[in-house]
């Protein structure tokens, strides 16, 4: 697993805190949510944030 940059983790955590119902374990849905909730213009950064959020949601689902 790759190490994520700090800004990816910070923004992902902020999005999860503010909009927990906007995200789930589906990457494509999370990608659309990141696009609508942020002003990130870079496709690569958007995908990294969506991937991080997806991973966090999947981990939370396994614990529950």
Swiss-Prot record:
What is the similarity comment for this entry? Belongs to the eukaryotic ribosomal protein eS17 family.
- Database matches in Pfam families: Ribosomal_S17e
Question: What superkingdom does the record give?
Answer: Archaea
- GO MF annotations, alphabetized: structural constituent of ribosome
PANTHER family listed in its UniProt record = 40S RIBOSOMAL PROTEIN S17 (PTHR10732:SF0)
User: Which protein is depicted?
Assistant: Small ribosomal subunit protein eS17
Establish whether keyword Transcription is in the entry: no
NCBIfam families from the UniProt entry: PRK01151.1
Annotated organism of origin:
Halorubrum lacusprofundi (strain ATCC 49239 / DSM 5036 / JCM 8891 / ACAM 34)
Its Gene Ontology cellular component terms are: ribonucleoprotein complex; ribosome
Kindly state which keywords UniProt assigns to this record, in alphabetical order.
Answer: Ribonucleoprotein, Ribosomal protein
Q: Which gene encodes it?
A: rps17e
């Amino acid at each position: 697993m790759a190490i994520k940059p700090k800004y990816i983790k910070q923004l992902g955590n902020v999005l999860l805190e503010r909009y927990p119902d906007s995200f789930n374990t589906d990457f494509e849905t999370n990608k659309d949510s990141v696009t609508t909730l942020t002003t990130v213009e870079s496709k690569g950064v958007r995908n990294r944030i969506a991937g991080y959020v997806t991973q966090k949601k999947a981990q939370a689902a396994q614990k529950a």
